[in-house]
Amino acid sequence: MMMIYLSLSLGLLIFSSSNKHLLVTLLSFEFLILLLFSLLVYSNYMSMINAFIFLSVTVCEGALGLSVLVSLVRSSGSDQVQFLNE
């Protein structure tokens, strides 16, 4: 259980400090979602159908994030967040 909390704090640290590239931010966000899922499953808080719904929504969120990343790279040529202000 302590390992999950340590990973959660590390994931939050990476998410808050990664402000240059959108890909690193999306990967750290997915890492946090998977840690939240493992925490909920470990504590027996979710039933099996709720776990599948949670994972389905997470996959849809990841696909939308990747589509935003691809459109950003096609329009600006880079995944750096500083190009979003232009």
UniProtKB/Swiss-Prot annotation:
Pfam families: Oxidored_q2. It is a multi-pass membrane protein. It is found in: Mitochondrion membrane. Keywords: Electron transport, Membrane, Mitochondrion, NAD, Respiratory chain, Translocase, Transmembrane, Transmembrane helix, Transport, Ubiquinone. The chain crosses the membrane at residues 22-42, 52-72. This is NADH-ubiquinone oxidoreductase chain 4L. The keyword Transport applies. It is an enzyme of class 7 (translocase). It catalyses: a ubiquinone + NADH + 5 H(+)(in) = a ubiquinol + NAD(+) + 4 H(+)(out). Gene3D superfamilies: 1.10.287.3510. Disulfide bonds: none annotated. Core subunit of the mitochondrial membrane respiratory chain NADH dehydrogenase (Complex I) that is believed to belong to the minimal assembly required for catalysis. Complex I functions in the transfer of electrons from NADH to the respiratory chain. The immediate electron acceptor for the enzyme is believed to be ubiquinone. It comes from Artemia salina. Its EC number is 7.1.1.2. GO terms for molecular function: NADH dehydrogenase (ubiquinone) activity. The gene is ND4L. Belongs to the complex I subunit 4L family. The keyword Mitochondrion applies.
